[in-house]
């Protein structure tokens, strides 16, 4: 009877048991696979985290593998490439890069390098280090030693070569990782260590009797018996920096190498004010794509004899090999100059000092001739793989293309960490003027010209393997604000075939970390962006130099250029000029002047709140007098929230923009300038619950993207969970370009209600490729987009139809859109002005020059104007 009951029970619940077993098996599989899942990558490494435990490092890896594996592509033909490569390229990554590269020159460059690598004539196979090795001799066998499971003879690093182990392979790996000793065991195992094996553990050679899996003619230890070899290097110990200079020591002079990008001119001026002294040198490299910064900073050369801009400029993309090329070129320029200097320190506009210049000079004077770099602080082999040092990268078309795996040269130690360094003049002279007979340096230069993030490893590796190794100090003088969960989002995939990380901007909440630098040999912090947060910079300045007075003018204001009429104009400025010209016309009409030329657009923030952008333009009065005006404009998006919905009551900052920065959780298109080629992103803040006892809720929502014709163009499914803290979320849409110009609607809906609705403007274009649209075909190409992004077989849910226009309404609006898409000249301008006037508010205006008889305040007296006094960024004050 009991058996029959059991049988019935098993038959009844058999499907349930099978499902439970499957779920358990899947969980085990996922747990196993998760061991190898990495975090984010690169720019670097979190060198400040080097003191963490190995357990923490293992659970929070620094750099992720490439974002996706590549399928095996088909071979490329000469017709596809536009030329005949010199070999039949085999590497799948190289073929993929060739398929994606846009220009023929770039494809030829990739193919040439890929063929050279394939032929084995590109990289050096073996190099010889010139760092003193003490009493260690390469490849010397010390014999067979007894090992213990709980107390390894060589405990520095372990790996298992299942099919290829040999003493030589293990020696190469251990030397590369910086270990003086290598050991092979049990046929497949390789161990590395720093400590000399004890004589008491010595065994007869016959105890090591297992053949190597990679070479059966050689012996690779035994069962808990290890063949140990010397790698030929001594244990490396970084130098300890002195804290105070000896009495009577000559004070060093510093060459500050500023590598500048973007448009944050006032922050560059502010950095120069904090660092400036007549005895030091300030050499500035401005990215070759940044006309505005180069033009404005060039003015400093006439005022300051020790400030000079680099004439040979590079496009320094994230992770690019050009960054190392640029640094070496600038260092060479400094060596050729008349200036006398002892150290070069590279900084960006995102750096700021955390100690006074005098303290930095004292510290470096105590450490003359030493070189300050920050190592990765973790296992070298993991660093090599996560950093992509075992891959070849080629830079062209402002992109870093991954073209295949590579084997690093044997015989050298590999090191790396941060690309922010402080280098002595003798070392700079060595790396910038390699002698032909210096095979090591020549080979390393070639290696790192085809390396991702090369400046993060080049200087470290050269120091470790040359006669300069005794000058290595493991400190790059920086504290960096790493927040891995935010900073490692693979946000650089558009410029590099790899996943990358960046440090976060310092915020007021990070102040304790800045305060903690006081007793450490740290002199700079990064990153700072006043357009994200200026309050922390003010706090830092007051900590260093004393409090600002209450009368200090415009202390909490910040201005940053968006557009300047002297810039080289191309397609990137078409949208800005289209909207800017419209706002100029609207502001001119309001002031009763005839607008002539759009001069500048400038972002304005006060107390870290965005107050809009400033439109500066020239105009002519009815009397014939020429004047310049500046108008503050606030972008507006018209939103509605459901009044009675619990979710809507906690919804904030519901807006559509572009350039959403996941790291800083903000859309960097502050002016909300959206056009037919924009990649739209909706972002919002869901406020945390203040009632700890309230029941938790979750919401499954749908975001509808509705075009000016009332058609559904795309939708996103959103899942929002309750939280005790504010959550910033974003949702991208995939629309077909060009997007239809006009008033769009984003609706956030549930099953039966609308939670939020937002109307936003996709502005028509008045320019194309930097030139005004003058013909109907040109206008239709930019403003005539009427396509549908959804697939043809998409079935519209019945409950969504209430949010869209009827077919008749869509037909009528389509005819209107077709006509508008053909407009040029004044009719086009009137269409744009009508739309822009609804989504941008003209708040206030000022006049640049006195004596115009306009009833407007002078811009120099208007605290919001870009012409208002800004003493905190007034670099001319250094001349007084």
From Swiss-Prot:
GO biological process: chondroitin sulfate proteoglycan biosynthetic process; heparan sulfate proteoglycan biosynthetic process
Organism: Drosophila pseudoobscura pseudoobscura (Fruit fly)
Lumenal side: 36-880
Family: Belongs to the glycosyltransferase 14 family. XylT subfamily.
Membrane topology: Single-pass type II membrane protein
Sites where the protein binds UDP-alpha-D-xylose: 287, 316-318, 419-420, 502, 526-527
Residue stretches spanning the membrane: 15-35
Cofactor binding: number and manner: Divalent metal cations. Calcium or manganese or magnesium.
EC number, UniProt record: 2.4.2.26
UniProtKB keywords: Disulfide bond, Endoplasmic reticulum, Glycoprotein, Glycosyltransferase, Golgi apparatus, Magnesium, Manganese, Membrane, Metal-binding, Signal-anchor, Transferase, Transmembrane, Transmembrane helix
Superkingdom of the organism of origin: Eukaryota
UniProt name for this protein: Xylosyltransferase oxt
Annotated PROSITE patterns: WSC (PS51212)
Major subcellular location class: endoplasmic reticulum
């Amino acid at each position: 009877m009991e058996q029959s009951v059991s049988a019935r029970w098993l038959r009844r619940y058999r499907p349930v048991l099978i499902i439970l077993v499957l779920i358990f098996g899947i969980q085990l599989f996922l747990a196993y696979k998760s061991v190898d899942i990495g975090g984010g990558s690169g720019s670097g490494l979190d060198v400040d985290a080097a003191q963490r435990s190995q357990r923490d490092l293992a659970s929070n890896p620094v750099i992720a593998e490439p974002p996706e594996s590549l399928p095996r592509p088909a071979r490329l033909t000469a017709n596809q490439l536009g030329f005949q490569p010199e070999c039949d390229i085999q590497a799948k990554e190289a073929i993929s890069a060739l398929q994606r590269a846009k220009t023929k020159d770039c494809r030829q460059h990739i193919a040439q390098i890929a063929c050279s690598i394939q032929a084995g004539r590109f990289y050096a196979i073996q190099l010889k280090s010139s760092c003193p090795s003490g009493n260690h001799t390469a490849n010397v066998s010390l014999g067979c030693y007894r090992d213990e499971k709980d107390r390894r003879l060589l405990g520095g690093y372990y790996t298992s070569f299942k099919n290829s182990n040999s003493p030589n392979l293990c020696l190469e790996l251990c030397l590369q990782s910086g270990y003086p000793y290598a050991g092979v065991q049990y046929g497949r195992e390789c161990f590395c260590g720093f400590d000399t094996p004890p004589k008491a553990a010595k065994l007869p050679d016959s105890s090591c009797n297992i053949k190597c899996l990679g070479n059966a003619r050689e012996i690779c230890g035994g069962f808990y018996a290890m063949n140990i070899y010397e790698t030929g290097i001594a244990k490396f110990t970084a130098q300890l920096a002195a804290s105070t200079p000896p009495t009577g020591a000559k004070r060093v002079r510093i060459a500050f190498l500023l590598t500048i990008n973007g448009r944050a001119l006032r922050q560059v001026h502010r950095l120069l004010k904090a660092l400036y002294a007549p005895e030091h040198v300030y050499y500035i490299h401005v990215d070759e794509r940044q006309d505005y910064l180069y033009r404005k900073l060039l003015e400093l050369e006439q005022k300051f004899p020790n400030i000079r801009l680099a004439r040979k400029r590079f496009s320094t993309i994230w992770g690019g090999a050009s960054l190392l090329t640029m640094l070496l070129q600038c260092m060479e320029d400094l060596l050729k100059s008349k200036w006398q200097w002892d150290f070069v320190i590279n900084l960006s506009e995102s750096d700021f000092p955390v100690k006074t210049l005098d303290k930095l000079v004292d510290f470096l004077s105590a450490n003359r001739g030493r070189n300050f770099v920050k190592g990765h602080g973790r296992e070298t082999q993991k660093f090599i793989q996560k950093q992509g040092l075992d891959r070849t990268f080629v830079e062209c078309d402002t992109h870093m293309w991954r073209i295949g795996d590579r084997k690093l040269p044997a015989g050298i130690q590999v090191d790396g960490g941060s690309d922010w360094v402080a280098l002595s003049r003798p070392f700079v002279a060595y790396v910038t003027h390699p002698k032909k007979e210096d095979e090591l340096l020549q080979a390393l230069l070639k290696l790192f010209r085809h390396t991702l993030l090369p400046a993060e490893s080049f200087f470290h590796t050269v120091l470790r393997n040359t006669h300069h190794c005794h000058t290595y100090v493991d400190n790059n003088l920086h504290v960096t604000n790493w927040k891995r969960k935010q900073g490692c989002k693979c946000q650089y995939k558009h410029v590099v075939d790899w996943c990358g990380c960046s440090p976060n901007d310092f915020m007021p909440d990070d102040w304790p970390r800045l305060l903690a630098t006081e007793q450490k040999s740290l002199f700079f912090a990064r990153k700072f962006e006043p357009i994200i947060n200026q309050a922390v910079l003010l706090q830092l300045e007051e900590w260093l130099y004393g409090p600002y007075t209450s009368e200090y003018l415009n202390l909490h204001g910040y201005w940053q250029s968006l557009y300047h009429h002297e810039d080289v104009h191309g397609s990137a400025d078409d949208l800005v000029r289209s909207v800017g010209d419209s706002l100029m016309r609207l502001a001119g009409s309001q002031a009763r002047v005839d607008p002539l030329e759009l001069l500048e657009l400038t972002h304005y923030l006060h107390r870290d709140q965005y107050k809009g952008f400033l439109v500066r333009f020239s105009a002519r009065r009815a009397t014939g007098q020429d004047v310049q005006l500046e108008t503050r404009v606030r972008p507006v998006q018209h939103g509605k929230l459901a009044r009675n919905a619990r979710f809507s009551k906690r919804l904030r900052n519901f807006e559509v923009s572009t350039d959403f920065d996941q790291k800083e959780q903000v859309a960097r298109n502050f002016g909300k300038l959206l056009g037919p080629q924009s990649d739209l992103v909706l972002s919002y803040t869901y406020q945390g619950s203040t009632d700890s006892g309230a029941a938790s809720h979750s919401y499954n929502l749908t975001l509808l993207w509705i075009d000016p014709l009332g058609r559904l163009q795309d939708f996103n499914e959103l899942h929002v969970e309750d939280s005790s803290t504010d959550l910033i979320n974003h949702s991208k849409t995939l629309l077909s370009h060009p997007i239809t110009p006009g008033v769009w609607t984003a609706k956030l809906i549930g099953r039966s209600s609308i939670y939020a609705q937002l109307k936003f403007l996709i502005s028509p274009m008045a320019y194309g490729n930097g030139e005004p649209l003058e013909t109907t075909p040109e206008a239709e190409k930019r403003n005539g987009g009427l396509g549908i992004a959804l697939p043809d077989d998409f079935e519209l849910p019945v409950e969504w139809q209430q949010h869209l226009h009827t077919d008749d309404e869509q037909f009528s609006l389509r005819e209107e859109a077709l006509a508008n898409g053909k407009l040029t000249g004044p009719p086009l301008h009137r269409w744009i002005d009508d739309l822009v006037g609804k989504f941008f508010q003209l708040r206030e205006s000022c006049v640049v020059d006195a004596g115009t008889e306009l009833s407007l305040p002078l811009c120099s007296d208007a605290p919001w104007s870009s012409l208002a006094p800004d003493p905190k960024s007034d670099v001319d004050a250094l001349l007084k």
